[in-house]
């Protein structure tokens, strides 16, 4: 490489700075995407064209490990949530269901870029198809998502159902407050008849979501088995 200078003693230093790539300004080993813009990084007052690419992180690994609060010794789910300062995931008391699956740390979405492909909540912004394993974040949640796609409502519902029914096979193990979170669950008929429906099987649909099939129990005197149909046409039998 030929290097021309104008004879000025500082010209060689300036030329060296233009081709030198700065080190340790934007650490790659941490995988952090919250640092300064690599294009705006300057070295000794001279702008450089060195572009630093962050490491590619498996989005499912991020959603399962890195973005979840790690409870300290003796802390429960509610203590972890209170110490991290973010509201309840569904903004209602979720009873025992909250202890059945880990609650994602929604506060970390606020500091990340909307086009960050390593964060599963924002994958639809860069052309990724929303997957049922994404966080069950409420649509238009103020914790970081502003412009959402039209299928975020289905994404929220499918993810929520998958988390619940992958672990809860008997509805009698669910608190009444949890049943109110399921729009298609006929809570009124449950209160009227006193029945305790059972989830006898989980039927997968074309997208891989397992939907529960309710079976009726013997109604009390004066009660009757009622039926409810979800907006998608899935019949939830009581």
Swiss-Prot record:
It comes from the Viruses. This is Uncharacterized protein 072L.
